[in-house]
């Protein structure tokens, strides 16, 4: 009896030790990101399902603030030897990450993990933003890519006597529509998020105009800024005139306009396609999604939109097992059913051709009119060498410069020409600083 009890206790101890050993064998992989609200919930959901799908790795998502904050936190953590394994970085941080010496290229991560990963699964216009210009290999993995789109309140349109199924196609139409919307009682006719990305960078690409020389920096770090040309100045003048009339309202440098839209304050906003998740969740009215407006007088417009959003960078200095887990997770993210779900639930672009095709097969676009607008904008025309994106050093700081200068326009302290001229002048100083630091 006594010996039998000892035997049972021994078995229990052995099982406990076995389970403990198995638990200890799980490799935790920190994943720092900037997805909050509904987007953060979806990141957590995907990570949980990956963790449950296998016993060896545990992805640990950690929200680290907005894009600027998470990039700064990631670089600082790398310098102190405490970097996460995966860091989500917005698209304008690409040149900074490439020059940081803090990363392990994604293609190398897969190679070292003995995973035969086909980089051609990604939509070319998305992957091209994150590839090495010389080798064409992926440096980071596309994740939440977006383009700006136009959201409009169908009920406000109807009240103003406008066709709720016809969003404005040109900036001239938008200006006329917002005046009618305001007259019909809308406190805010039009607002825009991410003004540098939407009103300068994407406006330029959408009209077939370069943002900088050297094909927007893809061909070298000696690029200079070029967005102070007549077409861009004319556009900012139109917004300035609308602002003076009260038809365009400026709420901030990031996506503040999104909440103003889904709260019903603003009848129209231009914002990231990735804002669709929160708008769909919070809006208590019927809304529509339209393409970005274009200048009716511009030749050959619209051209193609350029992506925003972010990609996933793998940080250097981790052990072999961590990189194996990272590779497994990155491969999991591009499974057609996972990538399609991420696209459908968030409004971000389908990053793989298979995800796009699966979404079509499932009838998602037919059931959700407007959900394919971002994709159609990106594929509207084959990109020109200077409309496939931008790769400029110190771009986060350049965006801050643009924000400061445009704010001077909205407060009537500067003319559009003076503001854009000064943006280019100040921005070029930042480009030369980056060029010198990375020779």
Swiss-Prot record:
It comes from Yersinia pestis. InterPro entries: Bact_solute-bd_prot1, SBP, SBP_1_CS. This is sn-glycerol-3-phosphate-binding periplasmic protein UgpB. Keywords: Periplasm, Signal, Transport. One of its GO terms (cellular component) is periplasmic space. Its main location: periplasm. One of its GO terms (biological process) is transmembrane transport. Belongs to the bacterial solute-binding protein 1 family. Part of the ABC transporter complex UgpBAEC involved in sn-glycerol-3-phosphate (G3P) import. Binds G3P. NCBIfam families: PRK10974.1. Sn-glycerol 3-phosphate binds at residues 67, 91, 146, 272, 309, 348, 399. The keyword Transport applies. PANTHER family: ARABINOSE-BINDING PROTEIN-RELATED, SN-GLYCEROL-3-PHOSPHATE-BINDING PERIPLASMIC PROTEIN UGPB. Residues 1-25 form the signal peptide.
